[in-house]
């Protein structure tokens, strides 16, 4: 039924873009963060093309730097603990992440129906299942989507090489 060799005992599933549509939530959070930043600067608003060209799939700070550079704007780097209102690269990235978390919890995150069915079929077949992601917000997404195993016999670990999205 699953189309897997009989020797397979576990499956890894990527959270972002395979199980869930987090890209649309990221896109909205980036647009809000950048539009708030650009407001009053005489710059056009953040577009879908800007998302594709400058931030999609990049570590958060790289996305901020690349987008601002496309508009001829530079900010100091700042510190990882900069507040969301800090006029720094990392502050703007933190603002975006705060907006993302608000959207995750208020609007939810769409789960792809076919992926949910496959994940459930893997469970029913007795296969171990692991969800992987480079996102710092993995636990939040798993919680709001209901993809956390029940009962929760799992451990969430977050050790990305660098901060993403």
Q: Whereabouts are the PLM-identified features?
A:
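A short, basic/flexible loop-to-alpha-helix module at the beginning of a structural domain
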Residues: 1-3
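Substrate-recognition "cap/lid" segment bordering the active-site pocket of phosphatases
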Residues: 127, 132, 136-165
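Catalytic-core regions built around general acid/base machinery
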Residues: 114-125
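Generic leucine side-chain signal with a strong bias for well-ordered alpha-helical environments
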Residues: 12-15, 19, 119, 142, ...
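N-terminal helical cap/lid subdomain that shapes the substrate entry/recognition surface
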Residues: 5-15, 19-112
């Amino acid at each position: 039924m699953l189309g897997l060799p009989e020797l397979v005992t576990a499956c890894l599933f990527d959270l972002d873009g395979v199980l869930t549509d987090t890209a649309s939530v990221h896109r909205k959070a980036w647009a809000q963060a950048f539009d708030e930043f650009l407001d009053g600067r005489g710059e056009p608003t953040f577009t879908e093309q800007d998302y594709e060209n400058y931030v999609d799939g990049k570590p958060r700070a790289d996305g901020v730097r690349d987008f601002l550079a496309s508009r001829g704007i530079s900010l100091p780097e700042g510190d990882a603990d900069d507040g969301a209102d800090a006029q720094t690269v990392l502050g703007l990235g933190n603002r975006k992440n705060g907006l993302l978390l608000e959207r995750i919890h208020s609007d939810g995150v769409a789960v792809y129906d076919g992926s949910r069915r496959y994940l459930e079929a893997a469970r029913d077949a007795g296969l171990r299942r692991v969800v992987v992601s480079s996102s710092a917000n993995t636990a939040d997404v798993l919680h709001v989507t209901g993809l956390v195993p029940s009962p929760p016999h799992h451990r969430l670990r977050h050790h990305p090489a660098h901060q993403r999205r």
